[in-house]
């Protein structure tokens, strides 16, 4: 969907088909051996010319020309060289054609050449064609071997064709071929890729029983998979059965980090060093990445220092993690300075992942100009932006409120041939909703389904939020019903919260509480936002008693109140005329050990409640306490007190006049 101010519909452009052989009239006489007697052209000369020619179409033209000249008859070797060249270029049909020519001329295909043919099918993602070719192997005068079977299995693994892997493996055993460690490793990867960890562990035992000793790849594959599904402890037990290697340690460190067991990961790193196993760049980068993600940037830099002391140079992923950590800490300047130092100091070549870290970082800090500058630089140096690059920029423009910018990046993305995914579609829906272009947003969601990119719950949440914020509640409720009925997308608590917020803001509090019954019937767990939204709505609707009942339910449900909840409780007490109780709540929060403290809203609400209860002196005392606590009064705070004193003076004047 190309977008402009009117948001026109998507125009999909099919890529032109390129013929596999270029039919040219190029003069390739200079490639022929300049011999006075062309009949003396030798196999060695032809092979040399074919290998030296970097242009595949020219090499193929030479191959055909020399055959048509009757000066040379191609041999198995010249066929093999040409087929390998075409295979490396991914020209499947040309490879197939020359194989057929070899067969017609009675030449046998060697094992290595057949493996090259299988490899070209893998390269272009045609695993089934590779299997079909394999089962015709004898037509080309080549016998199956363990090596060929292994390459077929590996090709199938590349496309995760697990059923076909089992079928080919069964035929391999039927034909009397004993699997080797490479065969088993392919099978282990297939099992682990499909979360069949128990099967992989059994296969390890089978390997040993058959005298095929598992290698580092075997154990690393299984232990990595175990860590992925949370079986880190079991993975460590398995690792203790054999000589440890760095790749296994890396898998375990990664598993411990995913479980947030950083202490265990550090201890494992120490154990590696004690056993004489040097941590590599993956070991350090894994730890640095999790430390940066958790905001422990200083500790991450200490690991970088340790890494450099041990002579282990960082790679581009180490750099990306550290730059991301700087952005998360809010130090944009440090992030850019670190980037420049490491690029120059270590000669690192940034890739799209590294550039995306910069783009995302700048966008998250609202510096869209810098983000676009990085994007332009990527295009200039030939580093193609990917879907994450475009998604970050669209989201950055959307958050900044620039629909034109988001549309510009959207159209650049489509022009480049990069198809949007559900996240980018959702970002664009959000951008359109921010500018009240709800028809266009609805149209985009319809297009998603047609493009086989089903809208997700967050997509509908963005649309519903936009509608609710604009007061289009009836439309929002219609979308809410459609998302499940038409798109089979059940709402989550965020969806309900957006609707509750819309209803509460429209003072339709009864409908909001009616919606909570549906939430209960569906068994959807309430979040803190659910309670806070209803608390706010109840207070604004003049129902402080119901708001306080909600707090009781919140406690029973085991939800911890946050600063928003406490401010709502204080407001509810004040609206009930219980300002003293609200002040006690303020004292309780101030003395507690919670992570948060009363803010300007908390104090202002209590001051308002005290003034409302004719306790203006207490309000002034609370103001002084607020200032001494380092909290700056807002305009609302001063307005409450000024209005209180003005009203009191008016009342006094009225009383004196009446007397």
Curated annotation (Swiss-Prot):
It comes from the Eukaryota. Keywords: Repeat. The keyword Repeat applies. InterPro entries: Pentatricopeptide_rpt, TPR-like_helical_dom_sf. One of its GO terms (biological process) is RNA splicing. Pfam families: PPR (PF01535), PPR_2 (PF13041), PPR_3 (PF13812). PPR repeats lie at residues 75-109, 110-144, 145-179, 180-214, 215-243, 245-279, 280-314, 315-350, 351-385, 386-420, 421-455, 456-490, 492-526, 527-561, 562-598, 599-633. GO terms for cellular component: mitochondrion. Belongs to the PPR family. P subfamily. This is Pentatricopeptide repeat-containing protein At3g48810. It comes from Arabidopsis thaliana.
């Amino acid at each position: 969907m190309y977008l402009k101010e009117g948001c026109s519909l998507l125009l999909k452009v099919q890529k032109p088909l390129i013929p596999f052989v270029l039919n040219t009239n190029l003069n390739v006489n200079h490639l022929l051996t300049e011999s006075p007697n062309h009949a003396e052209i030798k196999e060695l000369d032809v092979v040399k010319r074919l290998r030296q020619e970097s242009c595949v179409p020219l090499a193929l033209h030479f191959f055909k020309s020399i055959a048509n000249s009757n000066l040379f008859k191609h041999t198995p070797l010249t066929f093999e060289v040409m087929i390998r060249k075409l295979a490396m270029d991914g020209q499947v049909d040309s490879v197939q054609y020359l194989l057929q020519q070899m067969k017609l001329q009675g030449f046998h295909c060697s094992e290595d050449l057949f493996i090259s043919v299988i490899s070209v099918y893998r390269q272009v993602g045609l695993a089934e064609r590779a299997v079909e070719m394999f089962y015709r192997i004898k037509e080309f005068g080549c016998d199956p071997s363990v090596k060929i079977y292994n390459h077929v299995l590996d090709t199938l693994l590349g496309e995760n064709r697990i059923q076909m892997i089992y079928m080919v493996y069964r035929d391999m055993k039927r034909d009397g071929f004993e699997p080797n460690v490479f065969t088993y490793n392919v099978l282990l990867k297939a099992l682990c890729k499909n979360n069949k960890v128990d099967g992989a562990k059994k296969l390890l035992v089978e390997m040993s029983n058959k005298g095929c000793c598992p290698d580092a790849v075997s154990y690393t594959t299984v232990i990595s998979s175990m860590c992925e599904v949370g079986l880190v402890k079991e993975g460590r037990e398995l690792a203790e059965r054999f000589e440890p290697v760095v790749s296994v340690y890396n898998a375990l460190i990664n598993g411990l980090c995913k479980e947030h067991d950083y202490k265990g990961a550090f201890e494992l790193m120490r154990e590696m060093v004690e056993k004489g196993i040097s941590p590599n760049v993956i070991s350090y980068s894994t730890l640095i990445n999790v430390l940066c993600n958790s905001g422990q940037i200083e500790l991450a830099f200490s690991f970088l220092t340790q890494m450099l002391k041990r002579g282990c140079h960082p790679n581009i992923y180490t750099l990306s993690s550290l730059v991301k950590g700087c952005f998360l800490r809010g130090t944009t300047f440090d992030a850019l300075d670190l980037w420049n130092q490491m690029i120059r100091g270590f000669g690192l070549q940034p890739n799209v992942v590294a550039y995306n870290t910069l783009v995302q970082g700048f966008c998250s800090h609202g510096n869209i100009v810098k983000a676009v500058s990085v994007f332009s630089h990527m295009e200039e140096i030939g580093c193609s932006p990917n879907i994450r690059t475009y998604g970050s920029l669209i989201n950055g423009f959307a958050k900044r409120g620039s629909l034109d910018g988001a549309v510009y990046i959207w159209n650049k993305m489509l022009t480049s041939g990069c198809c949007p995914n559900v996240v980018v579609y959702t970002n664009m829906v959000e951008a359109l909703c921010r500018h009240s272009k709800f028809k266009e947003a609805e149209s985009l969601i319809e297009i998603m389904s047609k493009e086989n990119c089903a809208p997700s719950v967050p997509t509908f949440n963005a649309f519903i939020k936009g509608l609710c914020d604009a007061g289009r509640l009836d439309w929002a409720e219609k979308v809410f019903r459609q998302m499940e009925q038409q798109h089979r997308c059940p709402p989550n608590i965020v969806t309900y919260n957006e609707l509750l917020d819309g209803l509460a803001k429209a003072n339709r509090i009864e409908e909001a509480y009616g919606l909570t019954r549906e939430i209960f019937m569906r068994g959807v767990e309430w979040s803190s936002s659910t309670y806070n939204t209803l608390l706010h709505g109840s207070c604004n609707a003049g129902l402080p008693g119901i708001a306080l009942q909600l707090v009781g339910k919140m406690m029973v449900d085991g939800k911890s109140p946050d600063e928003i909840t406490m401010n709502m409780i204080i407001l509810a007490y004040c609206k009930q005329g219980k300002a003293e109780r609200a002040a006690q709540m303020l004292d309780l929060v101030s003395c507690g050990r919670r992570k948060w403290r009363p803010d300007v809203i908390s104090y202002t609400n209590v001051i308002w409640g005290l003034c409302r209860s004719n306790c203006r002196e207490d309000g002034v005392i609370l103001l002084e306490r607020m200032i001494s606590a380092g909290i700056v009064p807002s305009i609302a705070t001063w307005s409450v007190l000024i209005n209180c004193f003005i009203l009191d003076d008016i009342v006094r004047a009225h009383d004196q006049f009446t007397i």
